[in-house]
């Protein structure tokens, strides 16, 4: 069953309205990595984008908590 962003992921966003920002981040990172997101994209390429999103979100959270490890 599709969620707010139209994907079939079971992950739920804790912050209402964050889906648009996450999608924007996903497409920006994919562009930086030269990945064209779509049905033909490999799991490895998608994983690299997802992994980078996770790294950036963790870094952002650390900075917000005052432990700014970069």
UniProtKB/Swiss-Prot annotation:
InterPro entries: SASP_alpha/beta-type, SASP_alpha/beta-type_CS, SASP_DNA-binding, SASP_sf_alpha/beta. One of its GO terms (molecular function) is double-stranded DNA binding. One of its GO terms (biological process) is sporulation resulting in formation of a cellular spore. Keywords: DNA-binding, Sporulation. Transmembrane segments: none annotated. The record marks 28-29 as: Cleavage. Pfam families: SASP. Belongs to the alpha/beta-type SASP family. SASP are degraded in the first minutes of spore germination and provide amino acids for both new protein synthesis and metabolism. SASP are bound to spore DNA. They are double-stranded DNA-binding proteins that cause DNA to change to an a-like conformation. They protect the DNA backbone from chemical and enzymatic cleavage and are thus involved in dormant spore's high resistance to UV light. This is Small, acid-soluble spore protein 1. It comes from Bacillus subtilis.
